[in-house]
Amino acid sequence: LQMCQGQNYDMKSSQALFPKHCNEAHDELSRYIKKCRDEQTKRAFREVYENLAEKANLTSKKLQIVCPKQTDDLITEGQALHHCVGTYIERVAAKKCLIVFVRRVEEPEKPFVTVEVSNGKIVQIRGERNSDPTKEVKKFVDLWSRKVLPMALQAA
């Protein structure tokens, strides 16, 4: 009943209160709500990075910072690196954190290192299987967080 109310069903309607096939009606409404939430989350996720993406990128001779373009990018990153960044989609969509990727310049599509930013600060830098970054990667991310991130966040 709460799901029906949330979707603005007529709560005086016998069809809403007493559907012929209650379980099927429940499952159908659940799928619809999940689809709507998924679409809203994907849209909110894309909006987070629309203004940020161009301003947040940084490239050196060996490394680059890139922003994800869609929610599937976080899932792919987590699967490839065997860590949990794929579970951060809703946090990013709710603007509780940002996720950016560190890539090797010669392999820009291959997941390498993932960075979490919260409240304008680096919270995590993780490689494959939650490994710590190399000194080179840490130095690059530190440079990015000092020189690029503050301006990117202001513009976003």
Where are these regions (language model features)?
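Catalytic-core elements of nucleic-acid end-processing and repair enzymes
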Residues: 1-156
